[in-house]
From Swiss-Prot:
PANTHER family: ARMADILLO REPEAT-CONTAINING PROTEIN 6. This is Protein aardvark. The keyword Cytoplasm applies. PROSITE patterns: ARM_REPEAT (PS50176), FBOX (PS50181). It comes from Dictyostelium discoideum. InterPro entries: ARM-like, ARM-type_fold, ARM_LRRK2, Armadillo, F-box-like_dom_sf, F-box_dom. Keywords: Cell adhesion, Cell junction, Coiled coil, Cytoplasm, Developmental protein, Repeat. Disruption phenotype: Complete loss of cell junctions. Lacks actin-containing adherens junctions at the top of the stalk tube. Has weak stalks causing the fruiting body to frequently collapse. Displays multiple stalks appearance during late development. Shows no defects in growth or division.
Length: 757
């Protein structure tokens, strides 16, 4: 039995000493961020040199609201008793899920959720297991009597579950003080020295100065936890909190994991004897409890260490575990969080994933804070991506751009490159690229970095590899839409050439194929319409989209999803850009595009973006004479005027509305009269008054008034309604176009003079 428990004792005392040496209980506070970096370790060590080991329990009780782990509760004597309690389960060698819950919830380490702090705190129940006491042998009657006396003394503490957190800690302090009073003063004074001696013996080193190297000690504990995490279950079942809890062991030279099924069967035996890994018979838990004490640990000559004996991760005290978890990488943190609910709650409460995400990928963390699908930065998707980044070979992110902080964007590209046949990974990486390319800050230029890293090619490859995966197609097209999104400058030129890369690499065919494969999927239809809208920027790309059947696909999407405002908006925008080509004007009308645009404008009259794109589409399509007549017959003029009336403060809607009226009124006397009769002149003048410094509104308003002034009655109405004054103001605010405003001003002045005569 001593051989079986020797390595176990050795490891526990090493961690116990480190925990006591750092005095983490003085620094962990829920109201502040946990000290999880290396600098906090050094601060803790420095503080330890200035603080005495005996702390005043009254000071701790006064600070209960700010420090949930007070010194009176976490004294070395209590930790020793916790270790002994958990050692019983280790030596019984029958740990199952139920037994772990029993140890964690019924004995010493009980996680409860505080109603005042909404966090989990550690509570000591001081209740022994009644089932184990009933199964004791007759030779242990004295031990049973002592345990029963302890239970009677602590009944008041265990029965106050509904009391406040402060009262619970006060009772715990009283129990701890009673326990400490029972010990001899000499044992309390020599405790630290004895533990130091035990550590030096158990470590097998002669020079005591080695223990004073805090960094080396921390590295050993860090390695211990990391190796333990490697032996745990992988993350193949992401949505399962705790798939199966089994006892996990670690040794310096080998790893093994004993299942809980056989151990559970052994627990049902009536002989209450258990066998260790090397075949030696182990006594029952109560007999072992009498032998596991400090005096046995000092028996140096009788211990022969078996390096193949293993260590149980579940025995680490919670406060120590909180500190040790901060050293783990993403992969190890995920594996260890699946071992039991206790560790899962610790990782969740202290926000280890969020801190790790923010430290390793700050740009991605910022981009993913504002999204619709990832409810918070520590969702399962973020955990999965962090784990894949952690295991990514360094060759995938070498030589990253200087503007790419820590190469985090290139790492995402590397994860895509390594998992081109994994649709789940591809969808999440495409979604990250979509969020990164959506420029939230002017200084961000992520779309150019993604293009230089070959992100566009990988996105298209993902679409090609998984044509029937709606999630991949949706997020891939969404990423392409943001990567190709750009606005023209004052000269009408675009600075983003990513759309050319998509067209040259066959992106149009893949996008249209996605629309055909997922016709009834609104997410796919929205993002494909969005990217087609951005691709139709010049004559070459417009023709390519039309030849491949893009206009038909867009019209079909608008027909199948009439109540989806996003699809209607992007569809109108795509038809708007495609309508710049003369042949596309005819094809759009043939496919029913005009009717679809007018229906969308009626259905979503209060949505400015849709009205903007609807007016823009009608503007381009109305340059065809047949289309202009079709728009007029279907009350398109009234819808354009309604958009201007409903959104007077939106300069873009006013701009496109005036532009649409220019083409609808061009050399068409009937439309000129209709526009004037429906109040179009007043709406144009109002737009120019409300937006005097918007060049688009001023120029398009001036053009609409000029076409309407071809009608003598309209000309006089414009002059008398303040049109001349507005032209003079526009000349001052926009001197580059002063000649055009002056021309219309003279025409109106002549009409006003003739009208007065």
């Amino acid at each position: 039995m001593n051989d079986c428990g020797s390595l176990f004792n050795k490891k526990l005392f090493k961690m116990n000493l480190l925990f006591k040496h750092l005095k983490l209980q003085q620094h962990l506070k829920l109201q502040q961020k946990p000290l999880l970096n290396n600098s906090s370790i050094n601060n803790n060590i420095n503080n330890n040199n200035n603080n005495n080991n005996n702390n005043n329990s009254n000071n701790d009780s006064n600070n209960t609201n700010t420090n949930i782990f007070n010194n009176s509760f976490l004294n070395s004597d209590l930790i020793e008793r916790l270790i002994i309690k958990f050692t019983i389960g280790y030596l019984k060698n029958n740990i199952t899920e139920d037994y772990i819950e029993q140890i964690l919830l019924e004995n010493q380490n009980n996680f409860i959720k505080s109603t005042t702090t909404s966090n989990y705190i550690l509570e000591e129940n001081n209740n022994n297991n009644n089932n184990n006491n009933n199964n004791n042998n007759n030779n242990n009657n004295n031990n049973n009597n002592n345990n029963n006396n302890n239970n009677n003394n602590n009944n008041n503490n265990s029965s106050s579950s509904s009391s406040s957190i402060l009262s619970k800690f006060n009772k715990l302090e009283e129990d701890n003080e009673l326990e400490l009073q029972k010990k001899q003063k000499q044992q309390l004074e020599q405790q630290e020295e004895e533990l130091f001696n035990q550590f030096n013996f158990l470590e097998g080193i002669e020079d005591q100065n080695d223990f004073l190297s805090e960094q080396e000690t921390i590295q050993k504990i860090k390695f211990l936890i990391k190796m333990t995490a490697k032996s745990m279950s992988n993350y193949s079942s992401p949505n399962t909190l705790i798939p199966s809890v089994s006892k996990t062991y670690i040794s310096p030279f080998g790893l093994s994991s004993n299942g809980s099924t056989n151990n559970h069967n052994n627990n049902n035996n009536n002989n209450h004897h258990h066998h260790s890994n090397n075949g030696n018979l182990i006594e029952s838990s109560n007999n072992v409890n009498n032998q596991l004490n400090v005096s046995n640990y000092n028996n140096n000559n009788s211990n022969h260490y078996d390096e193949n004996n293993q260590f149980d991760i579940f025995l680490i005290p919670t406060e120590m575990l909180v500190h040790l978890l901060s050293f783990l990488s993403a992969n190890d943190l995920w594996r260890i969080s699946l071992t039991c609910k206790r560790i899962w709650y610790i990782v969740d409460v202290f926000k280890f994933w969020e801190l790790l995400f923010e430290q390793t990928c700050p740009r991605i963390y910022y981009a993913m804070q504002f999204n619709s699908r990832w409810s918070n930065p520590t969702s399962f998707q973020s955990k999965m991506i962090l784990c894949y980044i952690d295991r990514l070979p360094t060759d995938n992110y070498k030589n990253f751009d200087k503007s790419d902080e820590s190469g985090q964007i290139k790492k995402i590209i590397g994860v895509m490159n390594e998992n081109l046949h994994n649709p789940m990974i591809l969808r999440e990486t495409c979604y990250i690229l979509k969020r990164l390319s959506y420029r939230q800050r002017k200084e961000d230029e992520h779309e150019s970095l993604i293009a230089r890293y070959g992100g566009i090619s990988l996105i298209l490859q993902a679409m090609k590899n998984h044509p029937y995966d709606a999630g991949v197609q949706e997020d891939a097209c969404g990423a392409l839409g943001n990567l190709t999104c750009d606005s023209p400058n004052n000269m009408g030129l675009y600075s983003n050439d990513n759309y050319l890369s998509v067209v040259e690499q066959g992106g149009i065919q893949l996008i249209l194929q996605a629309m055909k494969n997922h016709m009834m999927n609104p997410g796919v239809q929205y993002n494909t319409s969005f990217v087609l809208r951005n691709l139709a920027r010049n004559d070459v790309s417009e023709s390519r989209v039309a030849i491949e059947g893009g206009i038909q696909s867009i019209a079909t999407a608008m027909k199948n999803h009439p109540n989806h405002i996003g699809i209607q908006t992007q569809g109108c925008g795509a038809l708007r850009n495609l309508g710049c080509n003369d042949s596309n004007k005819v094809l759009s009308a043939k496919e029913g595009g005009i009717g679809l645009i007018l229906r969308a404008m009626r259905s979503f009259s209060s949505h400015p973006d849709l009205q903007l794109n609807g007016c823009g589409a009608l503007r381009n399509l109305a340059r065809n004479e047949d289309n202009k007549n079709m728009i007029s017959r279907q009350n398109g003029i009234q819808l354009v005027l309604g958009a201007m009336s409903n959104h007077p403060d939106d300069p873009d809607v006013q701009d496109e509305g005036c532009a649409a009226l220019i083409n609808l009124a061009y050399q068409d006397e009937a439309n000129e009269e209709t526009i004037a009769r429906e109040g179009g002149i007043n709406l144009i003048l109002k737009a120019m008054r409300n937006h005097p410094f918007h060049s688009g509104v001023q120029m398009q308003g001036r053009g609409a008034l000029k076409n309407l002034s071809c009608n003598p009655k309209n000309k006089l109405t414009i002059a008398r309604s303040g049109g001349i004054e507005l032209m003079n103001i526009a000349m001052q605010n926009h001197p580059n176009f002063a000649n055009r405003f002056l021309e219309l001003s003279r025409i109106l002045q002549v009409a006003l003079e003739d009208g007065n005569i």
